[in-house]
Amino acid sequence: MFPLKKSLLLLFFLATINLSLCEQERNAEEERRDEPDERNAEVEKRFLPIVGKLLSGLSGLSGK
C-alpha cells in the first residue's frame, strides 16, 4: 500500500508543477494577444491533453 501512496503523491506533485508552468506560459501569451476567441481555443487545446494523460496515469496506477 505504501508504494502506491508514494507513486500517487509523486504523480500529484509532478502534475501540479506542470500545471503551474502551463499557467505561467498561458499568462504570458495572453498578454501578447488581443482576441479572446484565440486565447480560449489555445487554453482548450493545452488543457485537454494534460487531463487525458493525468487520467490515463491514474487508471494505470489503480490497475496494478
From Swiss-Prot:
It is found in: Secreted. Antimicrobial peptide with activity against Gram-positive and Gram-negative bacteria and against fungi. Has been tested against S.aureus (MIC=2.5 ug/mL), B.pumilus (MIC=7.5 ug/mL), B.cereus (MIC=75.0 ug/mL), E.coli (MIC=5.0 ug/mL), B.dysenteriae (MIC=20.0 ug/mL), A.cacoaceticus (MIC=60.0 ug/mL), P.aeruginosa (MIC=2.5 ug/mL) and C.albicans (MIC=2.5 ug/mL). Also shows a weak hemolytic activity. Expressed by the skin glands. Residues 1-22 form the signal peptide. InterPro entries: Frog_antimicrobial_propeptide. The modification Serine amide is found at residue 62. Belongs to the frog skin active peptide (FSAP) family. Temporin subfamily. Keywords: Amidation, Amphibian defense peptide, Antibiotic, Antimicrobial, Cleavage on pair of basic residues, Fungicide, Immunity, Innate immunity, Secreted, Signal. GO terms for biological process: defense response to bacterium; defense response to fungus; innate immune response; killing of cells of another organism. It comes from the Eukaryota. Residues 23-46 form a propeptide. GO terms for cellular component: extracellular region. This is Temporin-ALh.
